[in-house]
Amino acid sequence: MAAVAISAIASPVTAQPPPPAREQLTIGITQFPSTLHPNIESMVAKSYTLGFTHLPLTAYGPDWTLQCLGCDTLPSLENGQAVRETTPDGKPGLRVTWRLREGLRWGDGTPVTAEDLRFAWEAGRAFETGFGGAEFYRSAYEFLSDDPRSVTLRFDKVTFDYASAGNFVPLPARLERPRWEADKRGYRSRTGYDTESANPGLWSGPYRVAGVQPGASIALERNPGWTGPAPAFQRIIIRAVENTAALEAQLLAGQVDMVAGELGLPLDQAIALERRTGSRFRFEYKPGLVWEHIDLNLDNPVLADVRVRQALLLGMDRGRIVQSLYGGRQPVAATGIHPDDPMSDPEVRRWPFDPARAQALLEEAGWKPGEGGIRRNAAGERLSFEFMTTAGNRAREQVQQVIQGMWRAIGVEARIRNEPPRVLFAETLSQRRFTGGALFAWVSSPENVPRSTLHSSEIPTAERNWSGQNYPGFRNAEMDALIEALPEELDPAKRRPLWARLQAITAEQLPALPLWHRADAHVWPQWLDGVRPTGHLNFSSLWVTEWKVR
């Protein structure tokens, strides 16, 4: 600020032309969403896009505290919008009420009402629909509404995060209910969010989807039904460039104005770009609740043996990878719980790089040194499995190759086969078609109970229409019990030992191999202000009305 003031005094006093009007902002990201439906599949590209176009009831803000976005007041026991009660079968339950924000409308001018949330609740309760967050809908056993702006859910248990509506968001009942009622199981492929994406009646945020070029870009325009603060740009283009080198080239050529850190350049690439470009762009490095890891398919007999999983982790020098590729800016992970999370256990087991111990575990598991340096079991089978990640992400592919070499040094063959993100997430992972390991990231929120990724009921199956994100197929009765008990304990001090035990199980059993907690690199033009990275699963796009042109 001082440097700016000095420069102004030293310069001749002349009339300055107004800054050029900027009607369009072009944003580069590295994935294209496989669907735009708010409740189907879990993908960062979709969540980032929906931040501009679909207003949730609640979200965690940049300060990691819960906020009302589509509601007017957060429910609490103190204000009476949350009430303890007894369920019809005699269990402790909770009645929670949200009131919709006044003036909330869909893009065609139709008010958002309780009926839109009733439809979302009914579709979520019909598990053949395949919505994510199945436990939320199972627990919410009754929907009540006294008026068009009032929504009450009765839950069959008490939970500490009751004020958060999570992914329980309005869906335009007049448009989507007929499609759903015609074919509940086939609804995910018939929804207007993917077949008529430009219908303004689907969108309730500051922007609406105006056009989609599948696999390439999504055009957003100001939503005429939006009654909140006006966003700065008439039009936003979200451009998907899966190859990060190509994305950087488009940024330098001015074909994109900014790269969203939520899904943008890897840290090492951004650091190198900042060194080369000086002050041309603004860079912000935001540490957050983003967990890079390798999911392992535990139905694979090789990976079903916990000794093999432990050996794989011992055989990776994660500290060296972080230091050489990321300048030490990303903390090595012990579990999926970030060290800054209030429930992180500093005493959780850690697996240092120890190739000798890794080889001893493989010997113990029956894998002996074999021809070509790859271990074999008594039946002569090679210790070999497929290793996947998102094609085009240069940093992930580089990490993958480094890990492949480290594993080969202990006698393990990892066969690399990568896929574009929209295929990997929409089909291979969500339908558990991967057979070995898959390197990707999960994004969470503060004190997020990992039900969808670790509870045995969340293993995706055809019968569940592939809902759930327990891609490894992890089954552990104690883990299930902890995940069910944790949300019901309102006292943080009493939750702490439950969290510690949950972390101990994941660190010992290793359904996924923890790598590091990621810092995201946000790259903005100098003329853009107001973007506030959050570091968690409610992305900066939710606060687009705060973005301004300097």
Segments predicted by a language model, with ranges:
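Surface-exposed binding/hinge segments that line
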Residues: 134-186
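Short helices/loops that flank or line small-molecule/ion binding pockets
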Residues: 109-111, 116, 245-256, 272, ...
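Gly/Pro-rich hinge or "lid" segments in bacterial periplasmic/extracellular proteins
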Residues: 59-65, 169-231, 235, 245, ...
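Alpha-helical secondary-structure segments
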Residues: 26-29, 113-120, 150-154, 205-206, ...
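N-terminal lobe/hinge region of extracytoplasmic solute-binding protein
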Residues: 28-88, 200-204
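Extracellular/periplasmic solute-recognition and catalytic clefts
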Residues: 124, 142-144, 210-224, 237-300, ...
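Detector for C-terminal structural segments
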Residues: 17, 29, 213-217, 222-224, ...
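Aromatic- and charge-enriched surface segment that lines or borders ligand/interaction sites
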Residues: 74-130, 152, 247-250, 302-304
